[in-house]
Structure formats: C-alpha cells, structure tokens
Amino acid sequence: MALSCTLNRYLLLMAQEHLEFRLPEIKSLLLLFGGQFASSQETYGKSPFWILSIPSEDIARNLMKRTVCAKSIFELWGHGQSPEELYSSLKNYPVEKMVPFLHSDSTYKIKIHTFNKTLTQEEKIKRIDALEFLPFEGKVNLKKPQHVFSVLEDYGLDPNCIPENPHNIYFGRWIADGQRELIESYSVKKRHFIGNTSMDAGLSFIMANHGKVKENDIVFDPFVGTGGLLIACAHFGAYVYGTDIDYNTVHGLGKATRKNQKWRGPDENIRANLRQYGLEKYYLDVLVSDASKPSWRKGTYFDAIITDPPYGIRESTRRTGSQKEIPKGIEKWEKCPESHVPVSLSYHLSDMFLDLLNFAAETLVLGGRLVYWLPVYTPEYTEEMVPWHPCLELVSNCEQKLSSHTSRRLITMEKVKKFENRDQYSHLLSDHFLPYQGHNSFREKYFSGVTKRIAKEEKSTQE
C-alpha cells in the first residue's frame, strides 16, 4: 500500500481492436520496463479509458514506444462523471505539479477527444472556456505547443444509444502516443515476401510484446514460414532465428501467393523482408528443419520463442519420418546418404504442441517466454485443453474468433523452473492430457458436416 502512494496516475487511451490482447500486452510491457501493473479500476472490458498507476513518466514513455494496443497516454490531473465532478477533481490536484507546465514562458494547446459521439466546434470551445479557472499563464500555440492538454469524454460503447451527457470525463497532460502506425508501415500488403498464412502485422507486434522481446534478445520461431514474427521482433532490436520443414518456403521457391504472380522471384525470402525494413543486421539464420526432431545441443539459447504452428487448415501439419524407420538398403549402423529426402508424415496437433512446450522448457532461459497460437473448436473448448508443462507458467490466454465455431487462442507462458529430463513426460501423468488430445481432430471438425450444420442452425435461429 505504501508503494501506491508514490505512483502517479495516468490515463491510457486504448485502441478498440483485439480487446482481449490489450491487458496482457500492457502488463508485459510494464514488467519489461521495471514497472508493475497497478490500478484502482475494477474492470477493463471493452472500455477505451484505463486509469493506471505508474512509477515514473519515463516508464510511461517507454511503454508507449512499444505498445500497439494503446493510442495515447496522459498524466491524469482530474476526472469525474460530470463536469462539476471533473472541476472539483482538478481543483484538488496539487498546484505544484501543474506549475512546471503552465508558467508564462510556455506554450500550450487544449484538445477535446470524445468516444462514441461527435461534438460541434461550438461545443468544444465551450468546454475549453470552462477550464479558465486553471492557472494557465503561457501562450496558446495551436501548431507547435510545448504542452498539450486534453479533455476526454466517454459516451459508452453503444452507437445506437448515445447518452446526452458523458459517463466519464477526464483531463490530463498528453505524454506520448503509441505505435499504432507500425500496423500500416509493416502491412503484409507492402511486404516483399509473403505466404498463405503470413501473420497480420498488428498481431505480430502484440506477440512480440507479450513475449517481452527486447534489444539484444535472441528470438526463435520453429515454424517460421515467411518470417512475419521475426520482423516484429527484429524491429524491437532482437536477433532472430527460425526453422521450417518446408524447403520451398525457407528458400523462397515455388508458386507465388500474390495475385497475378505465378512464381516467386529470385529475391523473395525472409532475409529480403528484413532488408526491406532496414533490419538485416538482426538476421541470424533460417534453416530447413523438423520441429519434432530439434537438432540442438542441450542448453538454454533463447530469450523468447514466438511462433504460429500450422493448424492443418491452410498449411499442413507435417513432420519427417517413415513407416519404415530406415530407408531401404540402409543398414541400422549406416547413415542415410546425402541424396535421401525424408518422407513426411502427419503431425498431430496435440503432439506438436507438447513437443513445442518441451522444446521451450529445455531451450529458454529462466524468465524467457513462449508465445504461440492454439486453435480450438469453440463448442468443446475448456481451459484444460491448454497444454501445460511443469517448467512453464501460464501468463495469459487470449481468444481471437475465427468463426462461430472456431477460434485460436494466443497462449503466453514463462519459464519458471530449470528443465530436467523427467519433465518431458509429466503430461502423461496428468488428468489434463486426455481432453487435450481432442486437438488431433481440430481439422476434421473444421471441415466436417457438423460444423456446417451448426452454422446453418445459427442462421435459421437468427431469421
């Protein structure tokens, strides 16, 4: 409790997109920069206005240099459910905290921001004039002010029922904006090398933030594909490395994904993507490799593992192997010839994710994070289906809906215990293991007549 007295209150203006991902992102970034999530607000839900307590303005600025879920942050001077409550709150704010930004040598500007309602210019001016009791001594400068102050009004979430008066009103000093522009500047549409399942730029940055990726980290993606997740991590200064079982994807060969382009060009590869954004210096390597048979020496190499495993829908789930474990004509003690190309077999989802967790537990540094997508069949989903490992602690579990009956969940886990050989078999002793095996049939359920029937029934019910 004593700590909370030393914290300053800030107002976060959140983007109304990927709502479930916002809280874990902010919590992860605050931990990354030496803060801790503290708030008197009971629930967050869909509201774009969050009141947080943060130790310093430097941490608030660092937070905004990373977040793609928040638009802006303000030092909160006052708030209330009516103009009168706001003015009373402002009058109780310590004058000594205001003075450095209101003195005669400074310039300032006041902005009005409304959520779910549009005000006329006359209404905006009226709200600004009502703040004349504040000790502003500087000059107004609308083009390049030294300090920007904002009145933010919340009119609720229902666009079909907009109240006459706001539910909440806030006043604060603008500190910084978030990194929402990265979503556009790193858009997949503008990218040199893409595939069928290239990750959306916004989600890539969210995953990097959930993983607490920072400068000089080593980040690994065992299902690298076209490397979209590596780009986001490299943007934050991490060195990136990946593997994939698909030779053509790793080497940029084969048919193109883009419309009106039949074959991939000579320079379509992951390294070229990093070069496109000026991030080539963070590229370590990308190899053709089977995630079910990692070729790593024992040790902890990675600060984070950020990945999007294939679900068997648009990309197949494969691993190397053979019905005959040894190629014909090769004795047990002999190595396979260089010309031998391993046969690929189907790779059950439950096996894939358990292998991924074992690999993360073995190769992550203590405190390192694993961030990955888990596809689920919504009608049968339970929290017990999320794979677990004794060395990994679940940090967050966020849902992104894909359809009325399917979704994928962004799972973030942190390594909290040193890996021991017996840990890789722990799941077999757990009651959680049996329901999780249902993921083997995710693809069948996705394409099944059951799925189509559910969609048809939902449609007829709505009619």
From Swiss-Prot:
Modification N-acetylalanine, positions: A2
EC nos: 2.1.1.214
GO biological process, alphabetically ordered: methylation; tRNA processing
EC category name: transferase
Alphabetized Pfam families for the sequence: UPF0020 (PF01170)
Location of the protein in the cell: Cytoplasm
Catalytic activity reported: guanosine(10) in tRNA + S-adenosyl-L-methionine = N(2)-methylguanosine(10) in tRNA + S-adenosyl-L-homocysteine + H(+)
GO cellular component terms given for this protein: cytoplasm; mitochondrion; tRNA (m2G10) methyltransferase complex
Keyword annotations: Acetylation, Cytoplasm, Methyltransferase, RNA-binding, S-adenosyl-L-methionine, Transferase, tRNA processing, tRNA-binding
One MF term in the entry's GO annotations: methyltransferase activity
Family: Belongs to the class I-like SAM-binding methyltransferase superfamily. TRM11 methyltransferase family.
Protein's job: Catalytic subunit of the TRMT11-TRM112 methyltransferase complex, that specifically mediates the S-adenosyl-L-methionine-dependent N(2)-methylation of guanosine nucleotide at position 10 (m2G10) in tRNAs. This is one of the major tRNA (guanine-N(2))-methyltransferases.
Description of how the protein assembles with itself and partners: Part of the heterodimeric TRMT11-TRM112 methyltransferase complex; this complex forms an active tRNA methyltransferase, where TRMT112 acts as an activator of the catalytic subunit TRMT11.
Cross-referenced PANTHER family: RNA METHYLASE-RELATED, TRNA (GUANINE(10)-N2)-METHYLTRANSFERASE HOMOLOG
Protein name: tRNA (guanine(10)-N(2))-methyltransferase TRMT11
Organism name: Homo sapiens (Human)
